[in-house]
Amino acid sequence: MVKAIVFDLDDTLYDCLHENDKAVDDTVRYVANELLHMDEVTVMKAFEEGRDLVKDQLSAWDMAAQHNRVLYFQKMLEILGVSPFRYDLQVYNYFWNNFLNRISIFPGALEFIDDMKARGIKIGICTDMTAHIQFRKIDRLGLTGRLDAMITSEEAGIEKPNRRMFDMITAKLGVKNDEVIYVGDSYKKDVMGAKNAGMTPVWYLSLQNKTDEDVLAARNYAELRNIVNKVI
């Protein structure tokens, strides 16, 4: 019996990839033209180099900090020969305010969640990222008050597909793993992670086409509703 539905957040409940790219472009323009009066290409190159350095340094430990934009912008400024103490938080806040003003929840998602809640099904979030910004996204997307629990990789100390994250969210929800439908866009992190944890995975195809015929998949929330209605 299905007692809970757990969602990945980024690119499952809203478009993260494309809005992130736009926010990066806007932030680079802001830094280049308003703060440092440098060429935009130079600033973008420094940002990309700084981001890659952070990921290279931290990804081996599978830490949420590898996603932290304050570190990306710190490295960017250091590469440009500018003191991060002067501008880092200003740039960080500019980026996230720009990003949050762009995002909107996928059509049908709130209605789907409300319907599941009305049927007594608990709703959780299991997401790689730092907790602070995920709470801000949840508020922006209108999910506050609709969720029963969330686990971030920052809280878990490890990232998906490690089973610890999946076990922690079910513990918070008070359900067993085999009582959960898990919805996420990453085949490796979400689909296989949930499957290996004993959940029923649904691959949310926001960024790619289906390649595994043995996996339930949905391209939108109308399709997800049809799948869930058959499973429960």
Language-model regions: role of each:
Residues 33-46, 79-92, 146:
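Short, surface-exposed acidic
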Residues 49-93:
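A metal-dependent, Asp-based hydrolase signature
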Residues 121-123:
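Short beta-strand/loop segments at the ligand-binding rim of alpha/beta enzyme cores
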Residues 95-102:
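Surface-exposed cleft-lining segments at the edges of enzyme active sites
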Residues 22-26, 67-71, 132, 164:
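A generic alpha-helix surface/boundary motif
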Residues 1-49:
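Active-site neighborhood of HAD-like aspartate-dependent phosphohydrolases
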Residues 1-5, 17-18, 33, 41, ...:
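Asp-based, Mg2+/Mn2+-dependent phosphohydrolase catalytic module
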